[in-house]
């Protein structure tokens, strides 16, 4: 919807923008100074983009290549102005960037908002508020802008009071770039002060690679204003170009917020200058919290790319594998050409070398964190563990390293916390144990209560419990660790005989022989509904279970395919009965074939329910159970 008069029109905000403006004003007021960080960061990005475009078209500088950000305020008019002489915007750019949120996962973001202001403020921080943060301190915002290389009469003015609409009109603007004029609310007037502005710039924008200046007016001896001048406030040296020993942790943390637009401090970072075959500097951060849309395949990820300190592009995903898409930061290469494009990056030897080095650097950071600060690593794992698991299929060269970083729950602790690494499991293995036992299930509750665990608990053998959706797929790539094979305890090939003494083995052999006719009778009744029927001694309190062949698709994988809308091959189960269980003994003693069949239906139904959580024909199961109960 829009009304237009000559070159001026009033347009309605995209509905998500209205919602975001309302949320920011009410959720971020306690941290209102971040508006300045966001607006200066945007101005810095605009300068980076101009510098990049001017590589192929020097006329865009319009005779002025000295880039910078300038702040001035007018107490009488109650305004604060943030100006840059960067790339600027056309009318179409203004409508696209200031009237809509062109982000993947926007609907998902809004669906996760609550009425809890502290939680919402964290989520908004992850989403990245950018320009809209101006409305935290201003009740009206005017933007005057002109795109570099356009005529002076092609400037654009945008104005909004942060309600449902905004106006846009053509203006004449002498200089390229953007002026953002904030008409301050009462609670924003503290920023109409030179010292307050200097404090905030020093805190948030010292690392910006271009000058950030304030218009200052000194007083003479009589208290009258002298002629004003621009005073540079920040160091204006790109942080990653400085020596590590000269950079405080607080500076690294603020730079992270600049590149990520996150509100929280990162968990850790790595700053490295490498000289040799490839000359480059990398500054890589691991966030403390996962972005709301991390599992969305359209989620923008990748590093900022600079070549010889000149900004080239955002979200250069070629330098980081997909399973490390949560990593933020930048890479500054001396070896790539300044006119590099995404297409050139794709098949470039330098790119491949830098990608390999950055991947090893991140995995090294994680290994160091896991060894030195277990609590911090578990914080990382809770946020990013499921994504890291993807690396087992994606990055065969680093498979062993990634496997060492995995964390799982086990039967050793009555807790769903995924806290044990595979190296820790191997250390605790029984002397005669040569395999890593694991179980996959839909949930922690289903895993810890699985009947398949009964003998393991009785013999004190630890089992890894896997219940993330990705885990069954994961295990098709993770076949061994530290020379130890993985063994699913729901597969037919499970052999626990080495944990039995000779007396147990002899007893089992005798029982197996005694139950031979019961097994044959059960198989005869079931026909081809099951692959095989056999006795098992791995159960204690459960009468029967179903298992799959070692090379047949497991239950969890079949369910995963079905959930994704793909056809899963029919799983043929092996039906295992516990000859020591009272119900199985009753079944064995039943002479009447019809009644025997009801026992088989009930025990198989129970086993299928425990394994799959559902039955193909529940009425048959209920009928058999009801008839047995009615006897």
From Swiss-Prot:
One of its GO terms (cellular component) is cytoplasm. One of its GO terms (molecular function) is ATP binding. It is found in: Cytoplasm. Its main location: cytoplasm. Keywords: ATP-binding, Chaperone, Cytoplasm, Nucleotide-binding, Stress response. CDD domains: HATPase_Hsp90-like. Residues 343-559 are annotated as: B. InterPro entries: HATPase_C_sf, Heat_shock_protein_90_CS, HSP90_C, Hsp90_fam, Hsp90_N, Ribosomal_Su5_D2-typ_SF. SUPFAM superfamilies: ATPase domain of HSP90 chaperone/DNA topoisomerase II/histidine kinase, HSP90 C-terminal domain, Ribosomal protein S5 domain 2-like. The keyword Cytoplasm applies. Residues 560-631 are annotated as: C. Residues 1-342 are annotated as: A. It comes from the Bacteria. Homodimer. PANTHER family: HEAT SHOCK PROTEIN 90 FAMILY MEMBER. NCBIfam families: PRK05218.1. Belongs to the heat shock protein 90 family. Molecular chaperone. Has ATPase activity. This is Chaperone protein HtpG. It comes from Aliivibrio fischeri (strain ATCC 700601 / ES114) (Vibrio fischeri).
């Amino acid at each position: 919807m829009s009304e237009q008069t000559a070159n001026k029109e009033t347009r309605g905000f995209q509905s998500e923008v209205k919602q975001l403006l309302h949320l920011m004003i009410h959720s971020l007021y306690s941290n209102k100074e971040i508006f300045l960080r966001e607006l200066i960061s945007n101005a810095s990005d605009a300068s980076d983009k101009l510098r990049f475009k001017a590589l192929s078209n020097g006329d865009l500088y319009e005779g002025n290549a000295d880039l910078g950000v300038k702040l001035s305020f007018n107490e009488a008019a109650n305004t604060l102005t943030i100006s840059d002489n960067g790339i600027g915007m056309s009318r179409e750019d203004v409508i696209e960037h200031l009237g809509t949120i062109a982000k993947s996962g926007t609907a998902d973001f809004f669906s996760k908002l609550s009425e809890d202001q502290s939680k919402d403020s964290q989520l908004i921080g992850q989403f990245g508020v950018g320009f809209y943060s101006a409305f935290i301190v201003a009740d009206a915002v005017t933007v005057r802008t002109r795109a570099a290389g356009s005529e002076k009469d092609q400037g654009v003015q945008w104005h909004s009071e942060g309600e449902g609409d905004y106006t846009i009109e053509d203006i004449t603007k002498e200089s390229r770039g953007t002026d953002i004029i904030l008409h301050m609310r009462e609670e924003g007037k503290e920023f109409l002060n030179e010292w307050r502005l200097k404090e905030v710039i020093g805190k948030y924008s010292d690392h910006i690679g271009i000058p950030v200046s304030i218009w200052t007016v000194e007083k003479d001896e009589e208290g009258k204003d002298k002629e004003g001048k621009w005073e540079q406030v920040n160091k204006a040296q790109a942080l990653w170009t400085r020596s590590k020993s000269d950079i405080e942790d607080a500076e690294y943390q603020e730079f992270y917020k600049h590149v990520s637009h996150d509100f929280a401090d990162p968990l850790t970072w790595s700053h490295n200058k490498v000289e040799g075959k490839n000359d480059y500097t990398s500054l890589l951060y691991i966030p403390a919290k996962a972005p709301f849309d991390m599992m969305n395949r359209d989620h923008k990820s990748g590093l900022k790319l600079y070549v010889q300190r000149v900004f080239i592009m955002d979200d250069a995903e070629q330098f980081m594998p997909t399973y490390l898409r949560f990593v933020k930061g930048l890479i500054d290469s001396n070896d790539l050409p300044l006119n590099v494009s995404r297409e050139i990056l794709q098949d470039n030897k330098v790119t491949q070398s830098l990608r390999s080095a950055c991947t090893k650097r991140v995995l090294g950071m994680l290994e160091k964190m896991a060894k030195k600060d277990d609590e911090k690593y578990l914080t990382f794992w809770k946020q990013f563990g499921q994504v890291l698991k993807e690396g087992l299929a994606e990055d065969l060269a680093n498979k062993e390293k990634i496997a060492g970083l995995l964390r799982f729950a086990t039967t050793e602790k009555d807790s769903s916390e995924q806290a044990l690494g595979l190296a820790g499991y191997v250390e605790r293995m029984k002397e005669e144990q040569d395999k890593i036992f694991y179980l996959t299930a839909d949930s922690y509750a289903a895993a810890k209560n699985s009947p398949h665990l009964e003998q393991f608990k009785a013999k004190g053998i630890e089992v890894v419990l896997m219940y993330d959706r990705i885990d069954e797929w994961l295990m098709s790539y993770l076949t061994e660790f530290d020379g130890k094979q993985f063994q699913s305890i729901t597969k037919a090939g499970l052999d626990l005989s080495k944990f039995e003494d000779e007396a147990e083995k002899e007893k089992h052999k005798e029982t197996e022989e005694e139950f031979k006719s019961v097994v044959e009778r059960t198989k005869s009744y079931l026909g081809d509904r099951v692959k095989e029927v056999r006795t098992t001694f791995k159960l204690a309190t459960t009468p029967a279970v179903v298992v799959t062949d070692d090379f047949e698709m497991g239950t969890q994988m079949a369910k995963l395919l079905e959930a994704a809308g793909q056809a899963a091959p029919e799983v043929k189960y092996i039906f295992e009965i516990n000859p020591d269980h009272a119900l199985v003994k009753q079944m064995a003693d039943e002479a009447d074939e019809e009644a025997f069949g009801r026992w088989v239906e009930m025990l198989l139904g129970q086993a299928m329910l425990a394994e799959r959580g559902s039955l193909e024909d529940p009425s048959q199961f209920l009928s058999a159970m009801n008839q047995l109960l009615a006897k």
